[in-house]
């Protein structure tokens, strides 16, 4: 007796359905009704089976066999399709463990043309066939065949073929692929129809057409879909948290003078060996001016610190904590404590010396050499230990300063005395009247305006 996947007993009856030509009770589905309605317009022509992915031609290669199960599609390049031994056979009602043996067949799908005119090949899809069926029905289990992966359960006898009938698409629909609990699906692949498949949506539409009691009962019996994690779910969660805290995730954080001062003070409060210089706390504030003992850093890198775009590639040369302690020469030196008026305390220095070795095979070697040459002993090239240029003044302030300098350079005459200021002013009518009495002729000329004409 041949087994039919998806059927517990070939002789069982159902409350609704119709018998096919081979005597097997076939469940009537919405898809069957659609096909039957379409066949009424064929005017006696022979029914043609609907093509599926396994029968569509691709570069002249046709697979004239229907799998009992939905396919597994690859969505990541470079991933290998394989299962752990004893796993990989889809489960179906009515198939005993002894018949769970077969192979996965790789179907190379068609290519398509992209908008820029290039041909892009779709990643392959895999279909399962029981041993003794499908495109390699004559092959023995374990034969080395390109595009074939053999799978079998632990109880299956792989020396004999499986007693499974071929699927007739006009009588049986493909079964959604499911595996036994504990099966590890190959990475980079997904099962077709594992989400909201067409059968699920059809069953939902049928349940809605029933009464309210039946609909409530069927909805309670339906399995709830598994929660899925979207790629951008982490960003959504972060945005919700920020919104809860009253912050806008899309708005860039503005650095004010107060916040920069707080950042700088926070860095300077750390021990010297734990400080990380940046824009708010430049290198020289963290570690002092450049000189013979601290000879690294050009003007730009001293301003930006670790925020400099060239710094990350230099950080590749920095030793790890393990390399620092175990790959360096260390010496513990006690230093003198503070002055006489300072409290007595023991001060030590852990002095170290070592080397970082690299060669031209290091990724980014040329860039590293360029950055090193620009920043090593840069204080000597820039004319002093302090290579940071003074902060430029604003244009308005600079112009005001220039005007002030011009005023300072111009020699200004001393102010006149009060007598001189009074003489230079014009005579009023009262002044003219008074002068007329003084003068003999009693007339004051019109041009008389100062004491020089008197």
From Swiss-Prot:
Polar residues biased stretches: 49-61, 215-227
Compartment list: Virion; Host endoplasmic reticulum-Golgi intermediate compartment; Host Golgi apparatus
CDD domains for the chain: CoV_N-CTD, CoV_N-NTD
Residues found modified as Phosphothreonine: 177, 428
Residue ranges of every copy of the CoV N NTD domain listed in the record: 64-193
Comp. bias intervals (Low complexity): 11-21, 193-212
GO molecular function, a single term: RNA binding
Main location: virion
Residues recorded with modification Phosphoserine: 170, 194, 389, 424
Binding site for RNA: 109, 125, 167
Any Gene Ontology CC annotation: ribonucleoprotein complex
Biased composition (Basic residues): 267-277
Family (UniProt): Belongs to the betacoronavirus nucleocapsid protein family.
This protein's name: Nucleoprotein
Organism: Murine coronavirus (strain S) (MHV-S)
């Amino acid at each position: 007796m041949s087994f039919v996947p998806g059927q517990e007993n070939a002789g069982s009856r159902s409350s609704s359905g119709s018998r096919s030509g081979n005597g097997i009770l076939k469940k009537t589905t919405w898809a069957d009704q659609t096909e039957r309605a379409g066949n009424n317009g064929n005017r006696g022509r022979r029914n043609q089976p609907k093509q599926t992915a396994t029968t569509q031609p691709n570069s002249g290669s046709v697979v004239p066999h229907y799998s009992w199960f939905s396919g597994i599609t690859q969505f990541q390049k470079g991933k290998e399709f394989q299962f752990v031994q004893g796993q990989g056979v889809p489960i179906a009602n009515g198939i005993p463990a002894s018949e769970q043996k077969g192979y996965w067949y790789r179907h190379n799908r068609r290519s398509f043309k992209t908008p820029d005119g290039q041909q892009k090949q779709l990643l392959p899809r895999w279909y399962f066939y029981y041993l003794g069926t499908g495109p390699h029905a004559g092959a023995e289990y374990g034969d080395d065949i390109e595009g074939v992966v053999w799978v079998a359960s632990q109880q299956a006898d792989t020396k004999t073929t499986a007693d499974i009938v071929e699927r007739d698409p006009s009588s049986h629909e493909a079964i959604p692929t499911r595996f036994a609990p504990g099966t590890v699906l190959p990475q980079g692949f997904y099962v077709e129809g594992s989400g909201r498949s067409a059968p699920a949506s059809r069953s939902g539409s049928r349940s809605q057409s029933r009464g309210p009691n039946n609909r409530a009962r069927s909805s309670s019996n339906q399995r709830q879909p598994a929660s899925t994690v979207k790629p951008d779910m982490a960003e959504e969660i972060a945005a919700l948290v920020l919104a809860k805290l009253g912050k806008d995730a899309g708005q860039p954080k503005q650095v004010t003078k107060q916040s920069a001062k707080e950042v700088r003070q926070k860095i300077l409060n750390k021990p010297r060996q734990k400080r990380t210089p940046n824009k708010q706390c430049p290198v020289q504030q963290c570690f002092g001016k450049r000189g013979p003992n601290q000879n690294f850093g050009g003007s730009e890198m001293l301003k930006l610190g670790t925020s400099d775009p060239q710094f990350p590639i230099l950080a590749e040369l920095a030793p790890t904590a393990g390399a620092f302690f175990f790959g360096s020469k260390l010496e513990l030196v006690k230093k003198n404590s503070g002055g006489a008026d300072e409290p007595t305390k023991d001060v030590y220095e852990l002095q170290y010396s070592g080397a970082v070795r690299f060669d031209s095979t290091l990724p980014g070697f040329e860039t590293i050499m360029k950055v090193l040459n620009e920043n090593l002993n840069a204080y000597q090239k820039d004319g002093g230990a302090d290579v940071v240029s003074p902060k430029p003044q604003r244009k308005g302030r600079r112009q005001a300063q220039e005007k002030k300098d011009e005023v300072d350079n111009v020699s200004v005459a001393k102010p006149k005395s009060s007598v001189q200021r009074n003489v230079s002013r014009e005579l009023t009518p009262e002044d003219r009247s008074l002068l007329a009495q003084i003068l003999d002729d009693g007339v004051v000329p019109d041009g008389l305006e100062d004491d020089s004409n008197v």
